[in-house]
A protein has these predicted regions:
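Glycine-rich cofactor phosphate-binding loops and adjacent beta1-alpha1 units
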Residues: 7-9, 49-50, 54-129
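Mid-domain Rossmann-like dinucleotide-binding core that forms the NAD(H)/NADP(H) cofactor-binding site
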Residues: 1-65
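Conserved acidic E/D residue at the C-terminus of a beta-strand in Rossmann-like folds
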Residues: 43, 110, 134
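Structured loop/turn residues at beta-strand edges in well-structured enzyme cores
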Residues: 10, 34, 78, 152, ...
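Structural detector of well-ordered beta-strand residues that form the stable sheet scaffold
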Residues: 16, 40, 105-107, 131, ...
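C-terminal hydrophobic helical "lid"/dimerization subdomain
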Residues: 94, 98, 137-191
Length: 191
C-alpha cells in the first residue's frame, strides 16, 4: 500500500508491476485502487499468470523476456509511467528501469540479497525518480478500513487455511511454495 501511495499513480498512467508473488499480488491490489489507465504485470510463473487472469481480467501480463517490448507497445509514452519492482532479483531491478519511460517513477518494493548498482551512463537522459516502498505501518488503519469496506479484497490470495496447531507445516508449505500456495490463513479457533 505504501509503495503504491508513494508512486504518485494517476488515472492516465501505465503501471508495470514486476513480480506476482504474494507481495507482488498485494502490490497489484493496491495499484488497482489508484485506477490507472493500464496495469501490466511481469511474471514468469504460469500458475501466477493464470491466477491474475482468473481474478483480475483487466490486468495485462507478460513474461520477463518480452516485457520491455510489450510495455513499449502497450503504453502511451514509450514505457511505463510507474514501475513497481517487487521480484527482488538483479535482472528484475535492471528490467524496472529499462521499462520505465523518461521521467518515470521506479519504486523498489523488493528486498535484495545483494546491493544493486545504478548504471548511470546507461540511464543518462531517462531522468528517473527512484523511491523505496518497503513496509510502513503508518497506513495500517486505512488498509483495514479499505478491507472492511470491501474496496480491498484480499480473500483470493488466501489459498490455504490451517489450524494453529499446524503452523509449522503451514510455514513449510509457504516457504517451499508447494500446492499453489499464495497466502496461508491461520485459524486460531481450530486449535
Amino acid at each position: 500500500y505504501w509503495a503504491a501511495r508513494i508512486s504518485d499513480i494517476t488515472r492516465e498512467d501505465t503501471v508495470l508491476v514486476i513480480g506476482a508473488g504474494p507481495t507482488g499480488l498485494c502490490t497489484l491490489l493496491c495499484v488497482m485502487l489508484k485506477r490507472p489507465k493500464r496495469i501490466v504485470v511481469c511474471e514468469k510463473d504460469e500458475n501466477r499468470i493464470r491466477f491474475i487472469h482468473a481474478h483480475y481480467p483487466g490486468v495485462l501480463t507478460v513474461s520477463p523476456e518480452e516485457c520491455a517490448d510489450f510495455v513499449r507497445a502497450n503504453s502511451d509514452h514509450g514505457g511505463a509511467d510507474v514501475v513497481l519492482e517487487v521480484a527482488g532479483a538483479e535482472s528484475t531491478f535492471r528490467l524496472a528501469w529499462e521499462c520505465a519511460r523518461p521521467n518515470a517513477i521506479v519504486t523498489v518494493v523488493a528486498l535484495y540479497n545483494q546491493a544493486q548498482s545504478l548504471p548511470l551512463p546507461e540511464m543518462y537522459g531517462k531522468n528517473l525518480t527512484f523511491k523505496t516502498g518497503g513496509v510502513d505501518g503508518c497506513d495500517s488503519q486505512e488498509i483495514l478500513d479499505l478491507i472492511a469496506a470491501g474496496k480491498l479484497d484480499t480473500t483470493p490470495l488466501i489459498t490455504h487455511t490451517v489450524p494453529l496447531r499446524d503452523i509449522a507445516a503451514a510455514y513449510d508449505l509457504f516457504e517451499h511454495r508447494r500446492d499453489g500456495v499464495i497466502k496461508v490463513a491461520v485459524d486460531c479457533s481450530m486449535a
